Amino acid sequence: MSRAASSPSGIQAVGAIPFGSHFCQFYRTKQDLIDTLVPYFEAGLRNNEMCMWVTSHPLEAEEATALLREAMPDFEEFAARGQIEIWNHHDWYLRNGEQRSAEVLQGWIDREKRALDRGFSGFRLTGNTFWLERSGWHEFVEYESMVNEAFRRFRIIALCSYSLDHCCAEDVLDVCRNHQFALARRQGDWELIESSPLKMAKEELKKLNDELERRV
């Protein structure tokens, strides 16, 4: 049976999104995270995707779980069948007390395989980078570059959250360079930030997904 090449993002400004997408969100407040991530995961769960939310301050795992439970009266049914995992960042990014980029990337890819083996349509994830120290920034930028290249080959949708209060102008450029597009608030509304090369990359990604769908 063929699988759809795209999925509803749950975020109005984004709309349907191809599998293989790796995009970022710049936020200022906890409410910014709630407004995007709760509908993002509800859409993924209802689209039969396996989901993983890696949390950090200001929105930790316990509160994230409570928010999904409040938004989705049937949330426990998804949780009971193991369709969603909600982790604190130190248990995922900093296992053994240090950041291991290749290990983290392989962990995402392994979960995508597990999702497909279990009959899910894909794997949806998010990670909040609030925990990231300045000393680890350059290593994390390299990790994001690896992720951006790798994820396009898998049925993965990934949203990375960056606090604008922790980013300088150079950081914002680093982040945008390693994501297919960015989501940010402008005058209260969420908007997409795309350059021409990124638009071309998305079009190429859609073509690749369409070709894969035809082959199945």
Indicate residue ranges for each PLM-predicted region.
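Non-catalytic regulatory/interaction regions at protein termini and inter-domain linkers
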Residues: M1-E203
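Amphipathic alpha-helical coiled-coil "transmission" helices that mediate dimerization
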Residues: S196-V216
